[in-house]
Each structure stands twice: as C-alpha cells, then as structure tokens.
Amino acid sequence: MTEPTIKLNYHKTRFLTSAPDIRHLPEDNGIEIAFAGRSNAGKSTALNALTNQKSLARTSKTPGRTQLINLFEVEPQCKLVDLPGYGYAAVPEQMKLQWQKALGEYLQKRDCLAGIVILMDIRHPLKDLDQQMIEWAVSAQLPVLLLLTKADKLSQVARNKTAKMVNEAILPFQGDIQVEIYSALNKIGVDKLSNKLDSWFAPIFQQEGK
C-alpha cells in the first residue's frame, strides 16, 4: 500500500514550551522530531528558515545559548524539538554536564521521538560528538537527516565535495542516514528538509485516518 503524501505547513509552527529535562516535557505522545548539533551548528537559524519565522527559535552570536529542550508545535501531535547544543568549550563544566544529562535522557527515554536532524557546519563536519550522536541514533534504529549548514560559506564545488566526503564517511554506520546541503541564508535545502519531516510525521496521519 502506498503511503499517503502529506504536506505540513511549517510556517504555522508555534512555540509550545521549554523544559530543563524530560520530566518537565508534555505527555509523551504523537510524533516528535529532534534537531541536534554542536552549539555553533546553526540549529535555531535552521528552524527559523524552515518555519519562515525570524525569531521562532532564539538565535545568538554566543554559541551554547540553547540550554533548554525547546518544543514547537507544527500541528497537534506533530512537534519539532530544539535540543541543547553540545560541545561548546566556553560553557561552565557544571552547566555542560546538566545539558548532557538532559540531552541523553531525552534521546534515550522519549518514546514519541521518530527521527533526528543532526546539523553540522559544512566547514567542520563529523566532529567526535556528531559521530557519537549518529551512532546513538542508528543503534536506536532512528532515521537521521544530516544537514550540512552554512553552505553559503562555500562554493558549490566545495559544497558538493564535502557532501560526497560525508556520504562516504557515514557508510560504516549502516543506518538510515540522508545527507543534505543547507543554507538558511540562501534557502538552500529548506524544501528537502520539509519533505523529510513530512515523511517522518506521516504515520500520525495514517493512524488518524486523514
């Protein structure tokens, strides 16, 4: 049976809540898709480009500002989750440990998590923590979309070369992993991101018989 094609309007996305840890999140139901990445990978900027809302997700020149788990509702039962950024050295150690704990708990215990978008600066892809995140997602049998962000910083030739390198480097993970080039500034890859999210959200509409 062919899966129905759905097309969600991400421009209607609204902020739902922030939580310091999994215990303060809403009920674990519907479908959630998480956005994860290093503190300077441009997660908030990517979310704002997807939703066409300049300030939906708070951005800052200071990496590491996203200290909470932030939830956004696209439609009832369909949520995007902006996870705390990882790997920023200038953050106090105690705060870093708190973030890592919140991140780990969410990823391990949230049943409605259906996919992970891992964002990496195209100029510095596949750092150790990025690879750990990919490894975890694959072991949890979750599909992964790797977004190579800030693509406007490179020429098209350099972008394609990096994407090819990343595609080759992830083969040993043997998971459901897709690589896309992304630029919030030039709107490169926004449609591919929304199409992937649509496919991950689709089961909720099948359940509801829509």
Swiss-Prot record:
Where is Mg(2+) annotated to bind? Answer: S44, T66
Q: Which InterPro entries match?
A: G_ENGB_dom, GTP-bd, GTP-bd_ribosome_bio_YsxC, P-loop_NTPase
Highest rank taxon of the organism: Bacteria
Q: Which Gene3D superfamilies match?
A: P-loop containing nucleotide triphosphate hydrolases (3.40.50.300)
Q: PROSITE patterns annotated for this entry?
A: G_ENGB
Could you give one GO CC term from the UniProt record?
A: cytosol
SUPFAM superfamilies, A to Z:
P-loop containing nucleoside triphosphate hydrolases
Respond yes or no to whether keyword Cell cycle is given for this record.
Answer: yes
Task: Locate the transmembrane regions by residue number.
Answer: none
Q: Which residues form the EngB-type G domain?
A: 29-203
Query: Is the Cell membrane keyword given for this protein?
Result: no
Which residues does the annotation say bind GTP? 37-44, 64-68, 82-85, 149-152, 181-184
Q: What cofactors does the UniProt entry give for this protein?
A: Mg(2+)
Which keywords does this chain's UniProt record carry? Cell cycle, Cell division, GTP-binding, Magnesium, Metal-binding, Nucleotide-binding, Septation
GO-annotated molecular function: GTP binding; metal ion binding
UniProt-listed GO biological process terms: division septum assembly
- HAMAP family for this protein: GTPase_EngB
- What is the stated purpose of this protein? Necessary for normal cell division and for the maintenance of normal septation.
Q: Which family does it belong to?
A: Belongs to the TRAFAC class TrmE-Era-EngA-EngB-Septin-like GTPase superfamily. EngB GTPase family.
**Protein name, as recorded:** Probable GTP-binding protein EngB
What organism is this sequence from?
Haemophilus ducreyi (strain 35000HP / ATCC 700724)
Q: Gene encoding it?
A: engB
